[in-house]
């Protein structure tokens, strides 16, 4: 009797393929179950308030911008609007936007607080080393309008101007007070990637005589996103629209020209305007900024191929750092002693801490570019630690120990958004 070995092997091949498919299906079901749980946890948390987390008394604009999608979905839109408009009530005559505000009888941290006659129940402050407050506010308004459909908010009057006019003044503040003519980009103090701590001071949140001004990718990418958002929702005449289109076009050109290192396929950490505060004993150019790169991707500053390369580089850095997720802020980290603020040691806080607050946004970008396998891979460890810790935390050590504020709404917001985007693909 003659027979072919193929007939014997075929059932084994089919069994192997079936087993592989079952494993893949099981992993997918597991991820979706985790996502459903974390999404509900995020909604439950964000129904409870608007502060950044249990460790903060303030409503911070950079945080609010990252959970306003959820807040506008699960909370009364009139309440969300009130908290958003309060930032405009604190806007300064030069157009600048504060970081956060807190009930006037509840201040506890040593910020230089200031008051607003339009919101006497609060006091506010601004971390002047950072240059993302104005951009964050415009992005937050954009998200609020998209979810609620409340375009009328732009015509509301605050301090004698419409909200739209005040938002435009915020952008003009950046072009007037934070713009470097040589490079055609905006500047801030030297910080670690997207951070708000400069190295020259034991706290490091305010510009001073020791500040080293620098241009970085995070601030400029945030501004690009903000202008594009403004162009989407604002009612403008032809001349006004052309002006802002030219501004954003110039920013994008100059970002690629001066900040993008084509050979290394990464963004330069800083362009210094009055020298570097760091020792020349290490090469800062080797540092890869995860957060700033993520925001650059959101600003459409990288090609699809470069997005994939960026993700692979982030995962490579995670392995080298023995970290837990691509929320790793940067790698390699700044050495011991680089920052006078002792909380900024290696793998601590913004110097190599692991922040879902930014890693979750990279997941969203992977989804947007169609890299769904990579998005799920990146998302899984972020969901796992939320479930394990029974809540949301500000940041994590490389070995996944939660640090900083609990009930951190920024983490909840970006995970909620990524989960919604991922399962909208089906």
Regions inferred by a protein language model and the residue ranges of each:
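Amphipathic alpha-helical segments within well-ordered protein domains
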Residues: 68, 228-231, 297, 363-367
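Catalytic cores of carbohydrate-active enzymes
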Residues: 23-43, 59-60, 97-100, 175, ...
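Short, surface-exposed loop/turn segments at secondary-structure junctions
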Residues: 54, 153-157, 238-245
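Short, flexible helix-coil linker/hinge segments at the edges of structured domains or between repeats
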Residues: 182-210, 269
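Long, repeat-rich segments with strong aromatic
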Residues: 250-254, 300-308, 317, 321, ...
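Solvent-exposed loop and edge beta-strand segments that line ligand/cofactor-binding
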Residues: 24, 47-66, 72-74, 119-132, ...
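Aromatic-rich carbohydrate-recognition surfaces in CAZymes
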Residues: 58-85, 90-186, 217-221, 353-363, ...
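Bacterial Sec-dependent N-terminal signal peptides
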Residues: 1-26
